């Protein structure tokens, strides 16, 4: 069993990693390298699984999914980590994924991320619409102008974060900064999850959500 571990905490749910053969039988596309991971942008509705830790040190990351072309697929981290994600942008929708709609991210660590954007900035995704994060953790520093979160910048329309943990430090120059999500709204939920990073901003700041609008 591989347990997703932050610096201080083991996520409650444990992962029994799938083998290559099992993953292929379940219809997954195998991800083993940074180039494999970046290639997700060529099929945003695909079903993907990590088969190794991926170090993005030195990689000029192109955010996967945008407002007009969202990531709608699935990424199963399989208990592995994506480390050293680096983004320094003045644009909205920044993170490993920029914009997710109807997507699912599970069993994944985003470790040591350094993400800078404008609005809708997160370690995992900038914007989540009707999407799910389950059994994940994040560490690093996430910063921008507004709607900044350790996992998700803006989580809306029945999106969910469950059984997850963030130790990312979050900094908003203005408003809505949260340890897990900057703004949680429109029937979106956070369950069995916690954060243990520093959160800074001028207005609407929270350990889990900067603003929880229901």
Q: What spans do the regions from the language model cover?
A:
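Surface-exposed repetitive/solenoidal architectures
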Residues: 7, 12-214
């Amino acid at each position: 069993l591989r347990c997703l571990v932050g610096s201080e905490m083991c996520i409650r749910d444990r992962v029994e990693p799938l083998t290559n053969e099992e993953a292929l039988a379940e219809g997954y596309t195998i991800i083993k390298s940074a180039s494999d991971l970046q290639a997700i942008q060529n099929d945003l509705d695909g079903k993907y699984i990590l088969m190794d830790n991926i170090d993005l040190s030195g990689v000029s990351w192109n955010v996967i999914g945008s407002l007009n072309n969202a990531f709608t697929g699935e990424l199963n981290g399989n208990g592995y980590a994506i480390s050293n994600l680096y983004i320094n942008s003045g644009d909205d929708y920044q993170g490993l994924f920029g914009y997710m709609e109807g997507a699912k991210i599970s069993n994944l660590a985003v470790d040591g991320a350094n993400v800078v954007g404008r609005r809708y900035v997160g370690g995992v995704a900038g914007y989540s619409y009707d999407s799910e994060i389950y059994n994940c953790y994040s560490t690093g520093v996430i910063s921008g102008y507004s709607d900044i979160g350790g996992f998700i910048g803006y989580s809306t329309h029945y999106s969910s974060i469950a059984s997850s943990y963030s130790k990312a430090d979050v900094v908003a120059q203005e408003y809505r900064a949260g340890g897990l999500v900057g703004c949680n709204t429109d029937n979106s939920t956070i369950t069995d999850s916690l954060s243990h990073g520093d959160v800074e901003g001028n207005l609407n700041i929270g350990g889990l959500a900067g603003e929880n609008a229901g």
